[in-house]
Swiss-Prot record:
Disulfide bonds: none
GO MF annotation: an example: flavin adenine dinucleotide binding
Family: Belongs to the MnmG family.
Function per UniProt: NAD-binding protein involved in the addition of a carboxymethylaminomethyl (cmnm) group at the wobble position (U34) of certain tRNAs, forming tRNA-cmnm(5)s(2)U34.
UniProt-annotated binding residues for FAD: G13, G14, G15, H16, A17, G18, V125, S180, Q370
Amino-acid positions noted as binding NAD(+) in the UniProt annotation, renumbered to this chain: 273-287
Location, primary (coarse class): cytoplasm
Cofactors: FAD
Record's protein name: tRNA uridine 5-carboxymethylaminomethyl modification enzyme MnmG
Underlying gene: mnmG
UniProt superkingdom: Bacteria
Length: 629
C-alpha cells in the first residue's frame, strides 16, 4: 500500500550522513521523510566517541557554516576538547572533541524531532521505486510505499553487512542491528559498480577494572575550543581526562601467535580496511620493527563506565582479545564489556556520482556516507548535507550546487571521490587540498555562510551573527590601519619591547601586526592601540588575514589562473570517439567517467593537458563553448 502523503525528499538511514541530509532538505523548505530501521539509534556513534581531527575538523566547521548539525551537537556533548597542531600555522590547526555518546545522540534526536518539514518513520527499507531510470520513492520491510521526487540513500555499513569475530561471522549492519540484505540485493540488479570494504572497532572496557595509577593522563585544552560558530563554552558539559597506555612485546606475541585465527589474515575477509585506522593485528605485522604502539583510552560518557581503547581495533576471537587487553599496562585485570569486531559491507564506486552526489544511472537518487567508500563521521556528515541540499534542489527543479576544491574541503571530498574513486576507505586530510591556506577551520563561515544563506540553509540567527562578525572584522582592520607610530612617539618603548628590532620608521598598527613577533593581543596592549575586540572570532580573523595576506593573495592568483576552464560543461551524451585526436585510452576513460566539466576531466588519472586542449577545440568547433571560455 502507498502511504497517504507524498514527500519531496526521502532520506534512508539515520546516521551522521542521513541526519544532516534530512535536516538540509527540511531547512530548505522541502517536505522531507527520514526512514530509519530504529529511531532510537538516530545519530549514534557506531565506533569511536569523538568528532574532528586533522582535515575532519575542517569538514565539521564547513557543515556548521552551512547551517548543519554536527558542530552544535558536539559542543553540547563534548567531554574533552583539544586543538591539534596548535603550534603550527592556522591552515593545519584542527579541533577535536571526545563525546559523551548518550548526550550526542540525544541532542541529534531532539533537533530532528523539532525540525519543521521533517517526518520520522521507523521501518527498514527493502527496495526503491524506480520508473524509467528515475527514482519515485521507497518500499519498506512491511511493503509500505512512500512517494517522493528525490531519494537520498545513506546506508552506512548496513548494505550486505557481515560482522566477523574470529572465524565466526554473521549478518549485521552494526553490533545489535540487522543488515540490509534485501535492499543490497535490489541495488546489485542496477548498473552500479559495487565492491566490498571493511572496517573494525575495538573491545570496550569497564573503567572500574582498570588501574589508572600508572597511566599517563591526557587533559583537554583550557580554555576549551568551541566547534560551532554559534557555540559557547557554557554549552560544554563536564570535562574529563583521557589516558595513554601502550602495547608491548607480550601484546605483539599474542597477536602473532594467533594470526591463523584472524579472519583478515585467514582470507575470510576480502574487503579492504582503512589505511589510517588499521587493526592492531595489521599494525603489528606492517610495522614489525616497532615494539610498542600508543593506545588512547577514551571515556565513552559521563554516565557510563565504558572506555574506548583507541588503537586496538580487532577481529580476533574473544579469548585473544582478552589476552591483548590484559597484556597492556593498567589493564591486567580489565573486563571487556563488548568484544571488538570487523564488519564487511557493500560500497558503490563514487565515480558513478555527479558532483551533486546524484547517481549517473538513476535520476533523483543521491548517495552519501560510507556507501561512497568513505570512512568517518565527519566525511559522512559533509556528504549528507550536500546530498540533502541537492536532493532538495532537484525536487524544486533547480540546478544543483557543490563547492569547488578551492572553496571547501567539501569540494575536495566530492571531487576526489567522483573523479578518482577509491579502493579503500577514504579519509580526509589537510594534505589532500591544494589550497589549504585558504581552507582553514577559522574561515569556514567566511567561505560558505553567504552561499548557504542564498541556498536557504542558513537561518536568521546564524546570518545575523555572521554579519556582525564581518562588520567587526572590517572596522577593526580599518582602525588598525588608521593608528600610526614613529620612532619619536610616546609609546615607542612599549613597541620596541615587543619587536625584535627597534622601529626605524613610521608604521601603522596593521604594519606592526604583520611582523612575526607581534600578535593581536600584544598589539592592543600598547597605549593607544586598544581596546581589543570582544569578538574573539573576529580578532582571530584580523590577525590571520593581516599576517598571511601575501601568501593568501598568491594562492588566489593561482586559483584564478586554474579556473579559466574549470566549469566549462561537457555534454553528458558527448561521444568521445568522435573527438579527433584523442587516444583510445583517453576515449575509454572519458567515456567511462562521463565528467561533467573540463575541470573534472583534467583530474582523471591519465587525462593529459594535450587531451584537454583537444576537448576544448572540439567544444569550440561545435559551438559548445560559451563566450570568454
Amino acid at each position: 500500500m502507498f502511504y497517504q502523503d507524498n514527500f519531496d525528499v526521502i532520506v534512508i538511514g539515520g546516521g551522521h550522513a542521513g541526519t544532516e541530509a534530512a535536516l538540509a532538505a527540511a531547512r530548505t523548505g522541502q517536505n522531507t521523510l527520514l526512514l530509519t530501521h530504529n529511531i532510537d539509534t538516530l545519530g549514534q556513534m557506531s565506533c569511536n566517541p569523538a568528532i574532528g581531527g586533522i582535515g575532519k575538523g575542517h569538514l565539521v566547521k564547513e557543515v556548521d557554516a552551512l547551517g548543519g548539525l554536527m558542530a552544535q551537537a558536539i559542543d553540547h556533548s563534548g567531554i574533552q576538547f583539544r586543538t591539534l597542531n596548535a603550534s603550527k600555522g592556522p591552515a593545519v590547526r584542527a579541533t577535536r572533541a571526545q563525546a559523551d555518546r548518550a548526550l550526542y545522540k540525544a541532542y541529534v534526536r531532539s533537533v530532528l524531532e523539532n525540525q519543521p518539514n521533517l517526518t520520522l518513520f521507523q521501518q527498514a527499507v527493502d527496495d526503491l521505486i524506480i520508473e524509467n531510470d528515475k527514482v519515485m520513492g521507497a518500499v519498506t520491510q512491511m511493503g509500505l510505499k512512500f512517494r517522493a521526487k528525490s531519494v537520498v540513500l545513506t546506508a552506512g555499513t548496513f548494505l550486505g553487512g557481515q560482522i566477523h569475530i574470529g572465524m565466526e561471522n554473521f549478518s549485521g549492519g552494526r553490533a545489535g542491528d540487522p543488515s540490509s540484505i534485501t535492499l543490497a540485493q535490489r541495488l546489485r540488479e542496477r548498473p552500479f559498480r559495487i565492491d566490498r570494504l571493511k572496517t573494525g572497532t575495538p573491545p570496550r572496557i569497564d573503567a572500574r577494572s582498570v588501574d589508572f595509577s600508572g597511566l599517563e593522563a591526557q587533559p583537554g585544552d583550557n580554555p576549551t575550543p568551541v566547534f560551532s560558530f554559534l557555540g559557547k563554552r557554557e554549552h560544554h558539559p563536564q570535562q574529563v581526562n583521557c589516558f595513554i597506555t601502550h602495547t608491548n612485546e607480550k601484546t605483539h606475541d599474542v597477536i602473532r601467535n594467533n594470526l591463523d585465527r584472524s579472519p583478515m589474515y585467514a582470507g575470510v575477509i576480502e574487503g579492504i580496511g582503512p589505511r589510517y585506522c588499521p587493526s592492531i593485528e595489521d599494525k603489528v605485522m606492517r610495522f614489525a620493527d616497532k615494539d610498542s604502539h600508543q593506545i588512547f583510552i577514551e571515556p565513552e560518557g559521563l554516565s557510563t563506565h565504558e572506555l574506548y581503547p583507541n588503537g586496538i581495533s580487532t577481529s580476533l576471537p574473544f579469548d585473544v582479545q582478552l589476552q591483548i587487553v590484559r597484556s597492556m599496562k593498567g589493564f591486567e585485570n580489565a573486563h571487556i564489556v563488548r568484544p571488538g569486531y570487523a564488519i564487511e559491507y557493500d560500497f558503490f564506486d563514487p565515480r558513478d556520482l555527479k558532483s551533486t552526489y546524484e547517481t549517473k544511472f538513476i535520476e533523483g537518487l543521491f548517495f552519501a556516507g560510507q556507501i561512497n567508500g568513505t570512512t568517518g563521521y565527519e566525511e559522512a556528515a559533509a556528504q549528507g548535507l550536500m546530498a540533502g541540499l541537492n536532493a532538495s534542489l532537484f525536487a524544486q527543479g533547480k540546478e544543483g550546487w557543490s563547492p569547488r576544491r578551492d572553496e571547501a574541503y567539501m569540494g575536495v571530498l566530492i571531487d576526489d571521490l567522483s573523479t578518482l574513486g577509491t579502493k579503500e576507505p577514504y579519509r580526509m586530510f589537510t594534505s589532500r587540498a591544494e589550497y589549504r591556506l585558504l581552507l582553514r577551520e577559522d574561515n569556514a563561515d567566511l567561505r560558505l555562510t553567504e552561499q548557504g544563506r542564498t541556498l536557504g540553509l542558513v537561518d536568521d540567527v546564524r546570518w545575523a551573527r555572521f554579519n556582525e562578525k564581518v562588520e567587526n572584522m572590517e572596522q577593526e582592520r580599518q582602525r588598525l590601519k588608521d593608528i600610526w607610530i614613529n620612532p619619536k612617539s610616546e609609546q615607542v618603548d612599549q613597541v620596541n619591547a615587543i619587536l625584535k628590532t627597534p622601529i626605524a620608521r613610521e608604521a601603522s598598527g596593521e604594519d606592526l601586526l604583520r611582523r612575526p613577533e607581534v600578535n593581536y593581543q600584544s598589539l592592543v596592549s600598547i597605549d593607544g592601540f586598544g581596546p581589543a575586540l570582544e569578538d574573539s572570532q573576529a580578532s582571530e580573523q584580523v590577525e590571520i588575514q593581516v599576517k598571511y595576506a601575501g601568501y593568501i593573495q598568491r594562492q588566489r592568483d593561482e586559483i584564478e589562473k586554474s579556473l579559466r576552464h574549470e566549469n566549462t560543461k561537457l555534454p553528458f551524451d558527448l561521444d568521445y570517439k568522435e573527438v579527433k585526436g584523442l587516444s583510445n585510452e583517453v576515449v575509454a576513460k572519458l567515456s567511462d567517467a562521463k565528467p561533467e566539466t573540463i575541470g573534472i576531466a583534467s583530474r582523471i588519472s591519465g587525462i593529459t593537458p594535450a587531451a584537454i586542449s583537444i576537448l576544448l577545440v572540439h567544444l569550440k568547433k561545435h559551438g559548445l563553448l560559451k563566450k570568454g571560455e
